[in-house]
């Protein structure tokens, strides 16, 4: 989301976002950050059931609040630092971050180092299964990689070397332990074989070159097992509710980004146009889409899905200097 704001040059919105993110970091206890807050930084969002409501099409229970506040989702540290890094590099900002903010971010980075190879609920907030998720490990790597770059910008060579060393060690382990030789793909978790669409983020965050044969074969395998036409499911393993039946819309946009990066732009554009066609009359997308009926499911409208539209449009658009 932060990259979407950055790339669209929404500077005022970006400054507000960075200010909110700074408050999260400053308020963190020993570097730990819970995966979600209330808009006013509320930490307690207890989940309860409304027993007298049947739920959508009788598919209860109806929940109030979100238990995910209690989860350990280790990708959060990389996401925080990826978002906050903009404050150190972007000369459009009225108030750029400096050494004080960097020291606060380093606490978050140390937490990323501690949890890098520890099981968690993953970005999908799984309630009954913990693994060392590849996507979480990737974000721990991103935390260290961006801290090294921030330190270089601040002319702190010792800290740059420190964080670059952590990043390189993590990268070696991720590429080794998440690779499944049988499937010729990066798997959902260390030592696993199940596929998960979130590994498509490897190219976007920069841990692998999109032209790396391993990444290209991963895209091929993900398309084989998770895609129904333009739609893409999150993962193939059963979750808390069984095997997923609906496609998760942001995954289709991750696929579009990956295809464009590896040179399959024509296919990426066709998928993008298919996703635009299932929006409602106001141009909005839900969280999920049923791959057979095209019916919208899940939270509506869904920020992730709308960010996917924006990022996809920018990825597929020609540069002005190529058309003028």
Go through each PLM region and give its residues:
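Inter-helical turn/loop segments and adjacent helix faces that build the functional surface
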Residues: 8, 87-100, 119-127, 146-164
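Membrane helical hairpin/interfacial module
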Residues: 9-41
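C-terminal substrate/ligand-recognition segments
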Residues: 245-265
């Amino acid at each position: 989301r932060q990259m979407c704001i950055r790339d669209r040059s929404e500077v005022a919105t970006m400054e507000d976002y960075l200010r909110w993110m700074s408050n999260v970091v400053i308020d963190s206890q020993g570097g730990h950050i819970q995966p979600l807050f209330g808009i006013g930084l509320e930490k307690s969002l207890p989940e309860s059931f409304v027993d007298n409501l049947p739920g959508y099409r009788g598919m209860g229970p109806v929940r109030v609040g979100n238990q995910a506040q209690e989860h350990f989702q280790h990708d959060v540290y990389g996401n925080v630092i990826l978002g906050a890094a903009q404050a150190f590099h972007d000369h459009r900002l009225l108030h750029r971050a400096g050494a004080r903010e960097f020291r606060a971010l380093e606490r978050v980075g140390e937490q990323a180092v501690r949890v890098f190879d520890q099981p968690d609920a993953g970005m999908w907030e799984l309630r009954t299964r913990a693994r060392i998720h590849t996507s979480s490990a990737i974000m721990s790597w991103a935390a260290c990689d961006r801290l090294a770059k921030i330190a270089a910008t601040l002319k702190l060579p010792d800290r740059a070397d420190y964080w670059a060393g952590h990043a390189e060690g993590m990268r070696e382990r991720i590429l080794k332990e998440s690779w499944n030789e049988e499937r010729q793909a990066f798997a959902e978790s260390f030592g696993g074989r199940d596929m998960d669409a979130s590994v498509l983020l490897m190219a976007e965050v920069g841990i692998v070159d999109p032209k790396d044969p391993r990444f290209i074969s991963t895209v091929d395998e993900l398309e084989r097992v998770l895609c129904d036409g333009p739609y893409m499911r999150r993962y193939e393993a059963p979750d808390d509710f069984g095997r997923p039946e609906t496609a998760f819309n942001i995954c289709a946009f991750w696929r579009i980004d990956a295809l464009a990066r590896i040179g399959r732009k024509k296919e990426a554009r066709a998928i993008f146009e298919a996703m635009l066609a299932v929006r409602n009359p106001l141009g909005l997308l839900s969280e999920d889409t049923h791959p057979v009926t095209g019916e919208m499911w899940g939270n509506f409208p869904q920020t992730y899905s709308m960010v996917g539209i924006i990022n996809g449009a920018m990825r597929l658009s020609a540069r002005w200097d190529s058309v003028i």
